[in-house]
Amino acid sequence: MSAPGRVWRNLPAKAKAKVGAVLFGLFLLAAVIGPQVMPYDPSYANPDPSLLMARPSAQHLLGTTQTGQDVLSQLLVGIRLTIELALLVGVIATAAAVLVGVTSAFLGGFWDEFLSLVSNVFLVIPALPLLILLLGYLPQRGQLPTIIVLSVLGWPWGARVVRAQTLMIRNRDFIAAARESGERGWRIIAFDIIPNEVSLIAASFVNTVLYAIGASVALAFVGLTDLNSWSLGTILYWAQGQQALQLGAWWWFVPPGVAVALIGTSLVLLNTGIDELGSPRLRATRGAARIAGRRVWPTDPTPVLAQLTASRGRLGGFLHSFSRGSLLDETTPAGGELR
Amino acid sequence: MSEPIVGGLPASGLPVTGEPAADASAAPAVNADAEQVGEPAAVTSAAAARGPLIMEAVALNKVFQLGRGASLQAVRNVSFGLYQGAVVALVGESGSGKSTVAKLLAGQERPTSGQVMLRGKPADVRRGRAFRRYKATVQYVFQDPFSSLNPVHTVGYQLSRPVKLHQAGVRDVRAAVTALLEQVRLTPAGQYLAKYPHELSGGQRQRVSFARALAAQPAVLLADEPVSMLDVSIRLEMLNLLDDLRARLSLALLYITHDIASARYFADEVLVMYGGQLVERGPAEEVTQRPAHPYTQLLIASAPDPDNLGSALKGGSASQSRASQSRASQSRAGNVGPAPAGCPFSSRCPLADDKCRRENPALQPLSPARAAACWRLDAAVPPPVASPR
Amino acid sequence: MSPVLDISGLSVAYRAPGGDVRAVKHVSLTLNAGEVVGLCGESGSGKSTLAYGATRLLRPPAVVTGGSVRYGGRRVTAGGDPVDLLTMSHRELHQMRWREISIVFQSAMNALNPVLRVQDQLLDAIRAHLPLSRGQAREKAATLLDLVGIPRGRLRSYPHELSGGMRQRVMIAMALAADPEVVIMDEPTTALDVVVQRDILAQIVELKETLGFAVLFITHDLSLLLELADRIAVMYAGRLLETGSAQAIMREPAHPYTRGLLNSFPSLSGPRRELAGIPGSPPDLRDPGPGCPFIPRCGHAVAACGELDMSLAPVTSGLPPGPVSHLTACPIVATQVSQEGVLS
């Protein structure tokens, strides 16, 4: 495995999740206060010719567009709009996915067949072309239609995953025991099954948000959303339309592009952390452990303390003996023998 | 000195056949056409001495459809009663249908034919309110303490639910839950309320399962292998607890197990199941001391008995190698044919003759309290039981 | 004759953020060629940790913190000194595995790969350790199934098509693939019915007589060991409490825990008597308390028990001394035994 690969594998889940959370938190902060603190109205086109497609300066920290609009302001509004849309789609689609997935697995029989059929059909439809078609035909182009369309196409994957998990849980004894106690069906679903799926639902939510960001940026880039609102994709649309790349106006398309990439990355990191936190088994088999200061892989034979410390040398052993939980203070045994 | 136990059957008196050929499938598929010949003998249950009849299984049959036209008769013509304050043990190997019987009695499955009677009236276990009312009288305890408790809820919450559902109008739920924990000897009860299942040992979890069943204040407790998954050293304590609960709460207890020794220790009446049928029934002491059916004899001979430890497992003897040869030849034949049309045990039984393979016997009476389903009862000489050292 | 496996003062711990869990504490055990040694203990007693730690199969965060595990099989030592598994490299251990020491794992249901046929799994084991061609390996797999009494036709079956007893036999066949000297059996019959269990045990004895390997049989069911084993070691909370021949343990249990265990089995042929079992539950290994770990559950405990160093001492008894020494960690019961003579 390559060095970066090894490093990635070994980072503990908590670190990944923390980095992801902090990064996403920053963007969330930007989304909330950004539009309040932005220096200019993003749509304001400054007619001053020296400020057309101008490089970043003290006045315009990220430069200006072809029509003299401030890129930084657009970026801040864009972050808010994009995150807003993505979170809304995440909530709606995940709620739908959980509802459909748990119900179909719990009820079984006809309902399971029917709901599975519905989710499979939606899964199979190629999403982007359908999105383009729908949005192309809808009279409005604003945020709302985009949210609706993305939610409608974004729930089936989560539904399938939740259904699979629910099928497994449904066969566990404690569900039958809840029935034995006389619990009603809906209470079993709400209080016995779903609490066991929290980390799955959280991961599914994050996944959906990620998908929504990607899809909305793609749609905006293609010009299918409201071009009067400044989402990140719209900025890129205009930048592309005005030949920003060819003209070398990197300050116009790099910031929104990087923002999209970073938001996506932060979500992926968050998700990895959730996966491993939710499944202790993943944690245990993850990678090497450190024992007595040395790295031990799961496929190595059980380490023997004497061997580990012997190869460290005296100074290392001396220093290590101060670490907490040191096993070096094992006293001579007085054990018996089976002869 | 006891008979050397060779290959699972006593070396004398019965031909040594050793390894049963029917080792291929865990559930001996019973031929659905193998109807029992004759009516099962009416027997006075040894448990009836303890108290009135509370629950009765009447000619229960359960056939599972396996898809592609195949079906599995898991339970055939099983009838018995549960009496207040008495323990009835249902003994059999995996695949014998004993768990299915319990599920039929619990209302988790519906019989294909036959009836479950509760206090003289047919049990009404349709969904909804009727089912919940049934649950207030008949409770089922699960086998696996590691999966019968919800891992995300505390013990206190999981016990409070059945209390609220069944003890309507109880003011202090916490006090009721504490009382339940004390009943199952989880004390001091207060410290268990906030614990999660993974913080408890197997034995403690199983006690919580008992407490949950008792919250409904049932009259009948169906315990499906309640101690099989616990360590040997705590099994006895749990059985003693069950016995104590039975006595104090006047429960009718159905104890399902594959361990016939614990059935002898604990039960009033023992019912032995094989291949979905009852093959023997009678008072616990008599069935275990003088087993009449060849399968019961096999069970008794195979069980490790601390008072009667045969030395046959250690040290090769001539009879040992003879047994192993015949065992090997038996198993080489494998078991890939359709189930026998007659007695389900006939493919493994050393006494089986043509009648056994053709006709499936119903329970034949042996005494007012005993019966066994076998055509060869006269020839099935029980192995001499050694006196303790 | 020197023992084929000599575990001496072995200690194994699991590193955990809250402090180390000492799962095995200074346990010594020997296995002579061709004998069956039973290791008895509840869940959490450390019996599996002992076996897997000795063969270095435990994954991190487990560490072997002390002791030695000397293997004296003739193929490896060539008549010389035994080799210590704890000092071997990964490569040397790989040579040892399966050819010298093999393991029949608990719960064959889970140990067999559900998506591979029996033949493929046997071939895996065979070709990993023996230099055979595919054809030779296939023939060997068939021979192994013959050995354990499974029809050859079953080679093409998947594990779920076999019964529990047959799956366990496949595991045994796999363990014998490279003709080892020592076979460690970890609760091989736990999930099986009594009838199948007895057949498997008889099969094991027969194979042992034929092929001549030694068996370390791990279980929580003492009654099995009393029938099957030559010598028995009783473990509790990571320590050995009592060791001796099966006869001695059965007739003169010299530790309150062993007595409690023997008193936990309802008898089939003896009189129907009231049994007490052992109250309480095993201690938390993170904080077992000083002295003997059995104190909270012991009816004979006195203040001095809290200061025991848990070394094993011979039992003075009314029985004539046999070739196998009978040792116990409980000084109180040892004296009782000598006073009371043979117990029933």
Language-model features: where?
Chain A
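Alpha-helical membrane-protein architecture signal
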Residues: P4-W8, T64, L72, L76, ...
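Hydrophobic residues within alpha-helical transmembrane segments
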Residues: V22-G25, L76, L88-A95, V118, ...
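Transmembrane alpha-helix boundary and packing residues in multipass membrane permease domains
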Residues: F27, V102, I132, G136, ...
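Generic hydrophobic transmembrane alpha-helix motif, especially the helices
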Residues: L61, A95-A96, A105-R172, L200-A202
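Transmembrane alpha-helices
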Residues: R80-A96, W186-A218
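Glycine-rich helix-loop "coupling/hinge" segments at transmembrane-helix boundaries
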Residues: L123, G136-L138, T166, N207-T208, ...
